[in-house]
Amino acid sequence: MVVQVGINGFGRIGRIVLRATESNKDVQVVAINDPFIPLDYMVYMLKYDTVHGRFDGSVEAKDGKLVVNGHAIAVSAERDPTSIPWGSAGADYVVESTGVFTTTEAASAHLKGGAKKVIISAPSADAPMFVCGVNLEAYKSEYKVISNASCTTNCLAPLAKVINDNFGIADGLMTTVHATTATQKTVDGPSHKDWRGGRAAAANIIPSSTGAAKAVGKVIPALNGKLTGMAFRVPTPDVSVVDLTVNLSKGASYDEIKQAIKKASETTMKGVLGYTSDAVVSSDFVGEVCSSVFDAAAGIQLTPTFVKLIAWYDNEYGYSNRVVDLLVHAAKVDGAL
């Protein structure tokens, strides 16, 4: 069996989700909706990518459809999610990647068009949130709308889980040094809710808020209220890095901490949490499929209970692969695979 998938919003995440499905035998994209990108432009945007390079396959427009590696994908341009013909295209699972319909009520509009389940590729205020490697066991088939949380939560939560399970986290602060995203400005412009966020992305390091650390408490209840954090937006096109500084409940040497993370990366969190001791920099992680790669050589320890841990993530590619993994997990639990 193959899960038939629809994508609403053909932006950074939507396009990379499609790329990720091309190497996953359990998933096939059958429909894409985007009111702002006509078919010929979809071909161009999928084929060429400044960060991730040219698409490794064939892409063309034919008979009003997007044809990827010989497979025809229905295309629509509806602004109202209730009007998207998911049912007629056979799309049972829909990836909601516009960044607009992020609540259960808003995302549920896709169900009216024939979708059976919606995966939001963003944090949600009220939809159940899941992070691969952390809390997938909490998923229930009765959920019609679920969230894959944020790219930063996907990086932070696996690392936090390993540390908390082995040593306990009394409390901690996170900083993500985050690559530029599409919502930022190329030159100074109006941004009424976030004045700093309106400054030129390529010319500034911009302090910003993030709910990623607090969201860890939603997927790891034992850490609820124990973590918070902030972001610095920096002038790089992709790949971000988490700096997690924690007070441990149980003292440990840095070697013991590294060993616990390495063990998890090779067993329970293989494919989600990576491990490296090389002298790496951000560009080394473009195209990284893990949610989080622990940088063993970059962390520092002050006392046995006070430590700074560093983890890299491709905020586009790794996250998009987890969207697909979450979808596949849901489909298996639902009996669709």
From Swiss-Prot:
The gene is GPD1. The keyword NAD applies. It is an enzyme of class 1 (oxidoreductase). This is Glyceraldehyde-3-phosphate dehydrogenase 1. Homotetramer. Its EC number is 1.2.1.12. InterPro entries: GlycerAld/Erythrose_P_DH (IPR020831), GlycerAld_3-P_DH_AS (IPR020830), GlycerAld_3-P_DH_cat (IPR020829), GlycerAld_3-P_DH_NAD(P)-bd (IPR020828), Glyceraldehyde-3-P_DH_1 (IPR006424), NAD(P)-bd_dom_sf (IPR036291). GO terms for molecular function: glyceraldehyde-3-phosphate dehydrogenase (NAD+) (phosphorylating) activity; NAD binding; NADP binding. Belongs to the glyceraldehyde-3-phosphate dehydrogenase family. The lineage of its organism: Eukaryota, Fungi, Fungi incertae sedis, Mucoromycota, Mucoromycotina. The keyword Ribosomal protein does not apply. NAD(+) binds at R12, I13, D34, R79, N315. The record marks H178 as: Activates thiol group during catalysis. Signal peptide: none annotated. D-glyceraldehyde 3-phosphate binds at S150, C151, T152, T181, T210, G211, R233. It is found in: Cytoplasm. PANTHER family: GLYCERALDEHYDE 3-PHOSPHATE DEHYDROGENASE (PTHR10836), GLYCERALDEHYDE-3-PHOSPHATE DEHYDROGENASE-RELATED (PTHR10836:SF76). The active site is at C151 (nucleophile). Induction: Highly expressed under anaerobic growth conditions in the presence of glucose and the expression is highly regulated in response to carbon source and/or anaerobiosis.
